[in-house]
C-alpha cells in the first residue's frame, strides 16, 4: 500500500479471531480489520473455533517508500517577472493554484504571481502513490519613482535638466545628447524632439522604466534686407 493508506483484511474459518500487533489495526478482534501501517509490517491472526481449538496465520502488508518531491527555482522575484520552477521525485504532477502558471511540461512551469504566492505540488509516483510539497515565491514591488524636467519645450542649443528620485541606480537613454547617462540628475541638449527613457533600479535589483518627451523647436531664420541708397 501507499504511505498513509489502509488495507482491509478479512479472515474466515473460525468463530472468533485475535489480531496482532493491534496498534495499526482498527480492531484486535473480528473477522475483518483495517490495517494502516506506516512501514512494512507482519501481522498475525489467531482463529478459535467453537470447540476452543486454535490456529494462526501470518501475513505481511508492504508499504511503499514515500516519494520526496524537490522543487528548484527562484523564490524571490520582482513584480512583473517570471520564475521557472522544476519539480522532481515523481512522474506526474499537479500544480495549484494554476491561474498564475504556464505549464511548459508536466514537471516544469513558469510562475508569474502578482503578489507573494505559495504553490502546492502533488506528485504521483510509479506505484500510484501521492506525495505533496509547497514552494513559495516572494514578489518584491518595483520602485516608485518621480521624474521631472526643468522644461519640456526647448529651442535648439538650449539644455534641459532631469531630476529623478525613488531608486538607487539610474540609467538614461539615449545617451548621445546627455552630459551623463547615470545619476539622479542629468542634463540634455537635444537637437530635435527626443523621447528620453529612465530605467531606475532599487536595492532589491527591481527596475522600472519611465519616458519623458522634450520638444525642440527650430531657431527663427532672420532675413536682412538693406535699404537701397540713392
Stretch-by-stretch model annotation:
Residues 13-23, 89-97, 166-174:
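Solvent-exposed loop segments of extracellular immunoglobulin-like
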Residues 66-73, 142-149, 219-226:
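Proline-enriched interdomain boundary motifs that mark the N-terminal boundary
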Residues 59-65, 135-141, 212-218:
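Interdomain boundary/hinge segments at the C-termini of tandem beta-sandwich modules
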Residues 29-43, 105-119, 180-196:
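Solvent-exposed segments in extracellular or luminal domains encompassing
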Residues 6, 16, 42, 58, ...:
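Exposed beta-strand and adjacent loop surfaces of beta-rich binding modules
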Residues 2, 27, 50-56, 78, ...:
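Short, exposed coil/turn segments at beta-strand boundaries within extracellular/luminal domains
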Residues 3-13, 79-89, 153-166, 230:
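A short beta-strand segment in extracellular, disulfide-stabilized domains
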